[in-house]
Amino acid sequence: MAQAWAFLLLPVLLLSSYASHRLFPSYITGPLCGSTTTSSSSSSGVRSFLCSQQDSQTPSPASTMYKTAFHFQPAKNWINDPSGPMYFNGFYHEFYQYNLNGPTFGDIVWGHSVSTDLVNWIGLEPALVRDTPSDIDGCWTGSVTILPGGQPVIIYTGGDIEKHQAQNIAFPKNRSDPYLREWTKVINNPVLLPNEPGMNSIEFRDPTTGWIGPDGHWRMAVGAEWHGYSAALLYKSEDFLNWTMVDHPLYSHNGTNMWECPDFYAVLPGNNGGLDLSAAIPQGAKHALKMSVDSVDKYMIGVYDLERDAFVPDVVLDDHRLWLRIDYGTFYASKSFYDSKKGRRVIWGWSRETDSPSDDLEKGWAGLHTIPRTIWLDGDGKQLLQWPVDEIESLRTNEINHQGLELNKGDLFEIKGVDTFQADVEIDFELPSLDDAEPFDPSWLLDPEMHCGEAGASVQGGIGPFGLVILASNDMNEHTEVYFRVYKSQEKGMVLMCSDLRRSSLRPGLETPAYGGFFELDLAKEKKISLRTLIDRSAVESFGGGGRVCITSRVYPAVLADGGSAHMYAFNNGNAIVKVPQLRAWTMRKAQVNVEMGWSAI
């Protein structure tokens, strides 16, 4: 076991400031090569308008080496929000915001892929293109609802030529088609306009999946700016076509920017099975309200008051910095659905690129969706837990297994025998007590990222830092750290989980922050802290404490683009000895993800 901690004491290389995570940076608003004013509505003649220059170029090393092997992304071009995932007649459907024209934001349509296992995907022609007055500016994010009788319906936001937003509806053209390739927009679109007093017509988007209220009428929520508040506005309908606004929002707040991509669903404490919103909700269930705001996905746990027709959070926090997060990294615009095949709730998020705009143009692609995760409510009813769907384990091969390891201060244990660029690692850390833990400062909850940056892996602590060093070059000038620090708060532990990218690459022009989040640890109930990290070339997803904190990171080490090799280690740099009862790792095979699209781009 090597004593090789000198690498962590090196000056931070290319430390970037904590760049603001604007949803659409300024570079994506410029002209697009091959852009058009409209798109064909015929699924048999969809035009991609791809730049001939991009098509004729030999793929660059960055295009191939940084492209993921088992994450969802189209063969090329721009992708952002997941929209309307569902399971229907034997297939999972993943719709997504997609630019047919290139790897920059614009000309958005609804991409469409299908799968039988959530791992391997068949790419189809776009389900929705911008070809009507109410969506000529773009077919923006929305949801799918399964109506009584098994009729799926898409409700989505469209923008008109003046960029005013409204909600539109489409039905499958042929329900007997197992892929549901073609969708027909209703003639009276848009079905919902922002006509009520106090509404902003350019901040009215992203309708949720519908649910049925106690009166038998449909409900749905739409993200909006309303009388200066951020709100999930509530609407009712008897037929899912004609909607009226309820005189109060589902929930609103006066301290954040507009809420995008709201999600609302029922959960049972301690039950990792999902609940179908179209069925009766069992007694004791709670509800989760998620909103995408300021480049992160935040949520609250509470109850859906049927009499008031409103969401009531269990804990009201005026400071939104204290709201819980779905993911503490590069993760946004998540969307969940009830998986009737396996009786679970599954969630996806969009992970944007954090390299430069010129890198995206060189690669010819930008963005991906995270690994689908099962999401449920923990036993105490306070927070959501997430874990990669079991199906992803079908890609595992070449397992290595270590048991009974002991990591002393300064120890590095190299994990050999797997592809370090495509790996799944599960490791348990065992703590005997909190005796060596440093005191916890509650103010750290306001900015865990800053605390990860100040207390990096090179800063020795009482208990921790301990965790993984991944994607490390031979000379350690490039490496990413995923680790824990344990603090003591009264009689419980407070665990800080960090994914530190500040030394992840020698390349210039990258965003390389230190992401982080806290979770509680009760040593009387559990003696171990689990860490699972999936490495997929430029995407790293980590799950700490059984999914209490999840962090998605995008990394672009030069060693990967150069075709070099990388190393992976378990480490401890804290005063307390950390035991590792089990460490397992696998190489991950490549999935078949939209490799052969089921349609021709002319």
Swiss-Prot record:
Catalytic activity: Hydrolysis of terminal, non-reducing (2->1)-linked beta-D-fructofuranose residues in fructans
EC class (word): hydrolase
Disulfide bonds: 452-498
Coiled coil (UniProt feature): none
Glycosylation-annotated residues: 174, 242, 254
Source organism superkingdom: Eukaryota
Induction: In the first section of the leaf sheath expression decreases after 7 days of cold treatment. In the second section of the leaf sheath expression increases upon cold treatment. In the thrid section of the leaf sheath and the first section from the leaf blade expression increases in the first 4 days of cold treatment before returning to its original levels. In the leaf tip expression decreases after 2 days of cold treatment.
Native species: Bromus pictus (Patagonian grass)
Catalytic-site annotation from UniProt: 81
Record Pfam families: Glyco_hydro_32C (PF08244), Glyco_hydro_32N (PF00251)
Signal peptide stretch: 1-19
Function comment: Hydrolyzes inulin-type beta-(2,1)-fructans. Has low activity against beta-(2,6)-linked fructans. May play a role as a beta-(2,1)-trimmer during graminan biosynthesis.
Activity regulation summary: Inhibited by sucrose.
Entry-linked InterPro entries: ConA-like_dom_sf, Fructan_Metab_Enzymes, Glyco_hydro_32, Glyco_hydro_32_C, Glyco_hydro_32_N, Glyco_hydro_beta-prop_sf
Expression sites (tissue/organ): Detected in leaves, with maximum levels at the leaf tip.
EC identifiers of the protein: 3.2.1.153
Name used for this protein in its record: Fructan 1-exohydrolase
GO function terms (MF aspect): fructan beta-(2,1)-fructosidase activity
Keywords (A to Z) from UniProt: Disulfide bond, Glycoprotein, Glycosidase, Hydrolase, Signal
